Amino acid sequence: MNTPTPTQRTWYRTTIFNVSVVAVCAFIAPGLWAAMNGLGGAGSADPYYVNAANAVIFCLQVVVCVFGSSLIAKIGLKWAFALGMVGFPIYASSVYCNVKYNNSWYIMLACVIDGICSGIFWLTEGAIVLAYPEKHRRGKYLAYWLASRIMGQMIGGAVTLGVNAGNQEEGHISVQTYLVFISIQAIGPFVAATLSPPEKVQRSDQSKVKINLPAGLKAELHAMWKLLGRTEILLLLPMMFQSVFSEAFFSTYNATYFTVRSRALSSLVASTCVIISNFLLGFFLDWRRLSVNTRAMAAFIIIYAFELSLYVYAMVVNKEYERQEPRPLFDWTDDGFGRAVCVYILMLVGFNLMYDYLYWLIGTVNRDGGDIIRLSAVVRGVESAGQAISYGINSVDSFLLSSAVAVNLSFFAACIVPSAFVIYRVGVVNGVKVHHIQQDETLQTSGEGSHDIMDANGKSDD
C-alpha cells in the first residue's frame, strides 16, 4: 500500500470524514433523543415523570464527565466514543415500554445506563469536534455537526408527524414512532467504530491533532483542577451552565400547549429554522475578513440581544396562557397557533445559536490542543449540571412555565458580564486584533490577557 503524500490523503483519515462520523452519530443518538424530547417529555402523555428521569441522566453525566477521561485513556477515544452510543437505544426502548405498558421501573434503569453511556459520549464527542478540525474551518464544522444533530430532530419530527397526523388530541405519540427511533439508534455504535484515532487523522494543513490522554486518575484530577483555575475558563462557567438550561422549558412548553400532531409539526419547522441559522452563524464565525475579536463580539451581541428579547416574549405569552381557564391546547387549525408556536421555534433557534457559539468560543480561547479532553469534560460536565437542575425543576407539575422562564432569565443575566470579559479579549495579541489563531500550539499570554498567537501577517496559511 502506498504511503499518502502531503497532498494525497486517505479519505477515511481526513477531517471531513471523521467529523462526518461524529455528525452521523449526532444525528442517530442525541438528534433522535432531542426529537423525542422536543415533543415534550419524550412524546409521552406525562412529561413530568420523563423530565425527572432525564434529570437522573444528566446527574450521572456530571460524574462521568469528571472521571470519564481515565476510561478514554485505557480504551482509546475511538472505542470510548462507540461505547457512548450504546445507551441511547436502551433509553428509547424504555420510553416505548413506559408508553405502551405503563412500565416505570425500566425507564429509571435505562436512564442510569444511558446516563453513564451518554456521559462518555458527550465527553468524547465534544473533544473530537473541538480537536479534529483545522481552526480556520472550525465554525463551519461546528455548524455541520450541530446541523446533523438537528437533522435528527427534523427527520424524527417528520416521522412523528407522518405517524400521528390524525391525532388532534393531547397525550402520547403513537408507539410505532418509538420503534423507528430504536431501530435507527441501534446502529450507532457501529457507525462510531469507523472513527479514526486522533494520531491517524490527516488534516488539510498537515498539522497534527494533539490530544493528551491522562496518565492516571490522580494526575488527571490535578490537571482538571489546574484547568478550572484558569481565569477565562472560570469566567465562562456561567455561560456553559446557562447555554443548555432552557431545553427542559421549551420541551415541556411544547407538551403542555399543543396537540400531538402540532407538537410534531412544530418540532419539524423549528429544526429547519435551526439548521439555516446555525450555518449562517458558522460561516460568519469563519469569515476571516473580520478579526477574530470582531466576529466574537458581534456574534455575542446579536445572540444575546435575540435571547433577551425572546425571554421577555416567552414570559408575556406564558403569563397570558396561565391566566386562561381551561388551559389552552393548540392544534395547527386553531386561532393563536402561530403566536404560540413562535415561542417554541424561536427558543430552539436561540438555544442552538448559543450552543454553536459557545463551542466556537471554547475552541478559540483554548490554550493548548492537548487539553481538549479535560476541557470537553469541563464544558459537558457543567452543561449536564445545568440540564439536571433544569429538568428537575420542570419535573414538578405545580411549577409554572412562567416561573421556569424567570429562572432561565436569571441565569442568562448572570452570565453576560463574566462572558463579556473573556470575549472582549479574544483574538487580541499585544494590542493587535488578529485574523487567525494557529492550530494546537501552546499559546502565549499577551499584554491584553489573551492566549492567542498569530503568524507574521496576522493571517493563516490555507
Curated annotation (Swiss-Prot):
The keyword Hydrolase does not apply. Notoamides have been shown to exhibit antitumoral activities. Notoamides A-C show moderate cytotoxicity against HeLa and L1210 cells with IC(50) values in the range of 22-52 mg/ml, but the IC(50) value of notoamide D is greater than 100 mg/ml. Moreover, notoamide C induces G2/M-cell cycle arrest at a concentration of 6.3 mg/ml. Glycans are attached at residues 102, 254. One of its GO terms (molecular function) is transmembrane transporter activity. Residues 449-462 have a biased composition (Basic and acidic residues). The chain crosses the membrane at residues 16-36, 55-75, 79-99, 104-124, 143-163, 173-193, 233-253, 265-285, 297-317, 343-363, 404-424. Residues 443-462 are annotated as: Disordered. Keywords: Glycoprotein, Membrane, Transmembrane, Transmembrane helix. The keyword Calcium does not apply. It holds the Pfam family MFS_1. It is a multi-pass membrane protein. It is found in: Membrane. One of its GO terms (cellular component) is membrane. Belongs to the unc-93 family. Part of the gene cluster that mediates the biosynthesis of notoamide, a fungal indole alkaloid that belongs to a family of natural products containing a characteristic bicyclo[2.2.2]diazaoctane core. The first step of notoamide biosynthesis involves coupling of L-proline and L-tryptophan by the bimodular NRPS notE', to produce cyclo-L-tryptophan-L-proline called brevianamide F. This is Notoamide biosynthesis cluster protein O'. It comes from Aspergillus versicolor.
